Amino acid sequence: TMLYKEMRRRGFTSVVEFQYLHHDKDGTPYAEAATMAIALLEAAAEVGIKITLTPVMYCQGGFGRPATERQRRFISKNVDEYLRLVEATKDACAKYSGSRLGVGVHSLRAVNPEDLQEVVRGTPQDAPFHLHASEQIKEVEECVATLRARPVEWLLSNLELSSRFSLVHATHMIESETLGLAQSGAVAVLCPSTEASLGDGVFPLRKYISAGGRWSIGTDSHIGIDPVEELRLLDSFQRLETHRRDTFPGDPGRFAILESVRGGASSDGSLNAGLRIGAALDACVFKASTPLVSELRSADRASTLILASGAAEVMGTFVGGNYKTAEPPSSESVAEFSRAVQKFRS
């Protein structure tokens, strides 16, 4: 709940939640398969943030390696067990306004190829499908050794990638993969703060954008949960990598905001991108009175928000037309959070 509160306070209006914990501490399946799903749905409902709840299939500890004991809480024994979890999650989502079902596997290294293809076919076709791909160089090397293809290369050759799919990170792609992913209609979900923290690498964004690729931003490990900061880091890393200042074409701030919103609407399955008459209003409201913004021409404001702004300038958010002021967490909610963390650690 605290995480979702902080995400909304900093400008997020929706979250795609990768739900990994399918079993109790000892690895025993929950009596109610959707136990953790319900907890997440209730947290999102309390905060008033939209959620695409995505149970994640994870079967092995790496290419050709069995799962470890430490992974016992999120391992699916087989496809049938995972599909039952999807159905339970779908039923739970139906009871909460502002929620929808997503599906996915962790990555090619976490499932075998046949199971991945079966999950793609066997899950609701209107549910967005997520997976990690080409996050780290070692992953790419092991994929080539096992499947005789790079991760994105394999996905392009063996799945019908489309706007249904979101590939998280996709950092280490060669040019043919970059162009193929861009032309597929799938979305690349970029998480700059996490990718920097883990030392993953830099996504080939300039080539991808030039080829018409769709993208969105994510927070992954939640080391950073400020959407403006994620866009600024994305731009900054590209500048460092390419030695150029024109990461985004045209009005860079406007382009970055609009494209990330469009990609995000595809990734979360809402397809609610931008402001449209009759549509529920999901928006972040920034202060117009701050020194950096108040004296600017309207044409310069979007770029200023991306390059020199952040969560401190967020006044509040609209989610489904309901406005909430951005306020620091109350002492009561902080105390409740501390108790929960202490209980978790005990």
Feature roles, as predicted:
Residues 23-171:
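Metal-coordinating catalytic core of metallo-dependent amide/deamination hydrolases
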Residues 122-128, 160-163, 180-189, 210-215, ...:
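Glycine-enriched alpha-helix->loop->beta-strand junction motifs that scaffold or abut catalytic
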Residues 133-186, 194-207, 221-230:
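Catalytic core of soluble alpha/beta enzymes
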Residues 157-160, 206-290:
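His/Asp/Glu-enriched, well-ordered alpha-helical/loop segment
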